[in-house]
Amino acid sequence: MGRSRSRSPERRRERRRSRSASRERERRRRERSRSRERRRSRSRSPHRRRSRSPRRHRSSSISPSRLKDRRDDDKKEPKESKGGGSKERQLAAEDLEGKTEEEIEMMKLMGFASFDSSKGKKTDGSVNAYAINVSQKRKYRQYMNRKGGFNRPLDFVA
């Protein structure tokens, strides 16, 4: 009756050939770009490095504000160390009286004379210490009078 709407076998073959050639070209181009850059895995889980040591990132340039802060710190440090050094020497001269040679050696090695506590005393480094560590009693959840409440340990409630 009527003509079939499908193309003739010859044309179909030609078209398939041209399509495959363009696909082949595209595939080759993709392979070249893949070889240039590292091929990415398809997994979405975070990449794990083989070494467990932390990576160190160093920025080559320092922002002007950081540079200014660093200069300020450098100016402050020498003054503090000069004042602190003479104080330590004075204390060391007073502490040497009535000490044995072993105690004097310990002072030189460790930098402090005795194991005396500094609790409640004002020290140079404690100027910034404003946070208070309050230890509270532990609170536990009640499991009695509950379904499945027995034979299980008490949970700590933070």
From Swiss-Prot:
It comes from the Eukaryota. Its main location: nucleus. Signal peptide: none annotated. Residues 66-101 have a biased composition (Basic and acidic residues). The keyword Transcription does not apply. InterPro entries: SNRNP27. One of its GO terms (cellular component) is precatalytic spliceosome. Pfam families: SNRNP27. Residues 13-59 have a biased composition (Basic residues). Residues 1-102 are annotated as: Disordered. It is found in: Nucleus. Transmembrane segments: none annotated. The keyword S-adenosyl-L-methionine does not apply. One of its GO terms (biological process) is RNA splicing. Keywords: mRNA processing, mRNA splicing, Nucleus. Part of a tri-snRNP complex. Belongs to the SNUT3 family. May play a role in mRNA splicing. This is U4/U6.U5 small nuclear ribonucleoprotein 27 kDa protein. It comes from Xenopus laevis (African clawed frog). The gene is snrnp27.
